Regions:
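Active-site beta->alpha loop and helix N-cap motifs at the rims of alpha/beta catalytic domains
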Residues: 2-145, 151
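Catalytic alpha/beta core domains of metabolic enzymes, predominantly
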Residues: 127-128, 139-243
C-alpha cells in the first residue's frame, strides 16, 4: 500500500465550451502536464472537480480516465463523497476496482450527522474497501466539522489514515498529530505552508492546478529539506494564487 506524501493537486474537471460535456482530451493533457511538472499526487472529483455537478456515468468515466492516464506514475485518490452511506460505498468500491490508490471522502453534507453517526458511516465505508481513506474536513461546505477529537475517534478505524484539514485553524494540524500519533497523516487544505510548519506531511492544493512545480517545491523545501527561508520565499510568490 502506497504512503501518501507531498503536494497533491485536487484537480479541475475540464468541460467543453458549452459546459455540457467533459473534455477528456484536455483532462489527459492536464494529467500529463501535472506529472511532468513534478506533482506528487492527483485527486479527482473533489470540490474543485465539481463532483456534485456530475452524474454517475460521468463520475465513473472521469475516475477511470484519471487512473488510466496516470498509470501509476503518482498516487491517485478519487473523491467518493455523497450524502448516502451506500452511495459512498458504491463509489469507493468502484474507485478501488478501477485502480485508485485511495479515496477522499467528505462527510454527509446535508444531514449534519452526530459523532457516532459519522463513525458508523466511515466504518461501513472502510469495511467495504481495502485502500486508504482520506477524510476531508471542510465545515464551510460540508456543514460538519471534524474536530481533532472526532478525528481521533475516526482514526480507530483501520484504513481511515489520512485527513485533508481544510479549516483556517492550523493549530488543528498540531492537535490531530498529538491526539492520533501515527494513526493519522495530516494534509493541509487551504493553509498548506502553515500546515507544513505544524507537522503536516502533505498538501491537497487547489493552486497547483495552475503552478504544480512551485507548489510541489514548497513541500520539498518545507518538509524534506527543512529550508524554511527558501520555502517562505516561494510561498510569498505563490500566495496570490492561494488567496
Amino acid at each position: 500500500m502506497k504512503k501518501f506524501r507531498g503536494t497533491f493537486t485536487v484537480m479541475i474537471t475540464p468541460f467543453s465550451g458549452d459546459g455540457f460535456k467533459i473534455n477528456f482530451d484536455s483532462l489527459e493533457k492536464f494529467i500529463d502536464w501535472q506529472i511532468r511538472q513534478g506533482i506528487h499526487g492527483l485527486i479527482g472529483l473533489g470540490s474543485t472537480g465539481e463532483f456534485l455537478s456530475l452524474n454517475e456515468e460521468e463520475r465513473y468515466n472521469v475516475s477511470k480516465r484519471i487512473i488510466d492516464r496516470t498509470d501509476g506514475k503518482v498516487p491517485v485518490l478519487i473523491g467518493t463523497g455523497a450524502e448516502n452511506t451506500w452511495d459512498v460505498i458504491r463509489y469507493s468500491r468502484e474507485a478501488e476496482l478501477l485502480g485508485a490508490d485511495g479515496v477522499m471522502i467528505i462527510p454527509p453534507f446535508y444531514s449534519t450527522p452526530t459523532e457516532n453517526e459519522l463513525f458508523n458511516h466511515f466504518k461501513k465505508v472502510a469495511d467495504s474497501i481495502s485502500i486508504p481513506i482520506m477524510l476531508y474536513n471542510n465545515p464551510a461546505t460540508a456543514n460538519v466539522d471534524l474536530t481533532p477529537d472526532i478525528v481521533k475517534h475516526l482514526s480507530e478505524i483501520d484504513n481511515v489514515s489520512y485527513i485533508k484539514e481544510s479549516t483556517m485553524d492550523v493549530t488543528r494540524v498540531r492537535d490531530i498529530i498529538r491526539l492520533c500519533e501515527d494513526k493519522m497523516t495530516v494534509f493541509g487544505g487551504i493553509m498548506g505552508y502553515e500546515s507544513f510548519l505544524n507537522g503536516a506531511l502533505g498538501w491537497v492544493a487547489v493552486g497547483s492546478n495552475i503552478m504544480p512545480s512551485e507548489f510541489a517545491k514548497l513541500f520539498k523545501l518545507s518538509v524534506i529539506n527543512k529550508n524554511i527561508d527558501e520555502a517562505r520565499s516561494i510561498y510569498k510568490n505563490i500566495f496570490p494564487i492561494i488567496e
